[in-house]
Structure formats: structure tokens, C-alpha cells
UniProtKB/Swiss-Prot annotation:
Belongs to the CobS family. GO terms for cellular component: plasma membrane. Keywords: Cell inner membrane, Cell membrane, Cobalamin biosynthesis, Magnesium, Membrane, Transferase, Transmembrane, Transmembrane helix. PANTHER family: ADENOSYLCOBINAMIDE-GDP RIBAZOLETRANSFERASE. It is a multi-pass membrane protein. This is Adenosylcobinamide-GDP ribazoletransferase. HAMAP family: CobS. Joins adenosylcobinamide-GDP and alpha-ribazole to generate adenosylcobalamin (Ado-cobalamin). Also synthesizes adenosylcobalamin 5'-phosphate from adenosylcobinamide-GDP and alpha-ribazole 5'-phosphate. It is found in: Cell inner membrane. Its cofactor is Mg(2+).
Amino acid sequence: MLQFIRHYLLAVQFFTRIPVTGRLADWVGYSPGMLRASAVHFPGIGVVVGGAAAAMFALLQLLLPDTTFTPLVAAAFSTVATVWLTGGFHEDGLADVADGLGGSYDRERALEIMKDSRVGAFGAMALVLALLCKVALLALLGSVEAVPEAGEAPAFSSWYVCAALWTGHIVSRGLPLVMIWRLPHVGDIAISKSKPLADQISAGGLAIAFSWCFGALALASLALDAINLIVACGFSVLALLGLLRFFRRRLQGFTGDCLGTTQQVCEIAFYLGLAVSL
């Protein structure tokens, strides 16, 4: 149990801006093997990030005047909260992949471009479009009129968004681990943003990772119907399968940036699936 907590805190330290310092950092410890093992808690980071996003959305819905644009403003600031909390870690991967694969059809040249820390035209477009998709879908979910059952009071539609944010951040962080399991790592580990993390994962590690996801889905079912969650997860899985095929064809494997891209695309797909099912 203590090892479980250490690995989780190491993942928190690595994937978020939350400080794990001083005596706590000494207790957690560090080694390349521990960092690799902490990858199974990738979905668990979604508990924190998604929780912060949901709290921001709910707070602004409560404090702001009730207008047509309130869900849009709340969605925008909840997205800002997630970007700040993660340091744009996954968005950076999306931009690098867009620059690399958009800038060259040659595999080696694409990998070289992806190592460049500068953001190009393709990366900028991908970032803007991804953020717009997130905000638009969350605002749409927040503006859905919740239809009550006979004899029940009208439901608070913001719970849709809070449940979507929390669950979407968890599920979308579990699916990239399937990519680690199925594809070889083709990046330069010495300079990879994920370092020894983006290497390999066992079936047992996947089981731990998906226990986070299944637990989140079980709790989310209190706010969302099962069919909503099934469709949302279905969209995310389809996005994952598409990216697996795409990266296998273009790169013959994955890099740390590909994992960040997968998280972003699967998160958007989750919100889209949820919106379609409501």
C-alpha cells in the first residue's frame, strides 16, 4: 500500500504542478524504475485534474449571472485551470505531433521536427482547434436542459459537465497506456519529455490503470445514464484505435508526444460522445 502511494505521488509530481517537496519528496523517493511504475497511475492524475476542472466549472456557474453565455465562460475557465495545473504537458505533445507529422511525410524528418521545442504553424492550429473543441463541447453540455422524470425536480445541468470533466480526464489518461502496451517506443528516451516513463507497461499495470477508470465510471453513473457513458467511452476508444493505426503507419511506434496527443484527442472524443448521447 505504501508503495502504491509513493508511485501515485511521484506521478502527481511528474504530471502536475502540485509540489511534492521536502520530507514528503524524500519519503516518496525517485528512480527510473519508480517513475516507470508510476505510469499506471496516469488515470489517477485525472482524479485531481478533472476534479479541479469540475470545481472551477461548478463555482463559476454558481457565482456568475444565469445567462446564455455562463456555461461558455465556465467552460473556458475550467479549461484554463487544467492547462495551468498540468503545465500544458499534453497540449505540448499535441502541438509537437502536429508539427512533426504535418510538416513532413518522412518518418525520420517528422521525428526530428517533433524534438524541436518551438511551436510551428501546424502545432499552433492543433492547439487552438483542440482548445476550441473542448470549450465548445463543455459549454454545450452545460447548456443542455436537464429533463426531470415525472414527479422529480429539474436536474442541475451543470452536474453533466462536472461528471463529464472528472470522468473524461480519468478515462483519457488511461487509454494512452494501451498505446505503450501495443506499440514500440521510437523516440529518443534520453531527451524525451516522458523519459523512462514512455517505455513499456505490463498487462498487470494496465489492470491497475483501468481500475481507476472503472471506478470513475461507476461514480459518474450517479450523474449520467449508463448509455451516456457507454457512448462517450466508445467514442474515446474509437479515437484511440484510429491513433494507434495512424502512429503505427506513420512512425512505426510512438513517442511521449504521441501519448500526450492521444490523451487530448480521447478527452475531446469523450465529450463529443457524451454530447451526442444526451
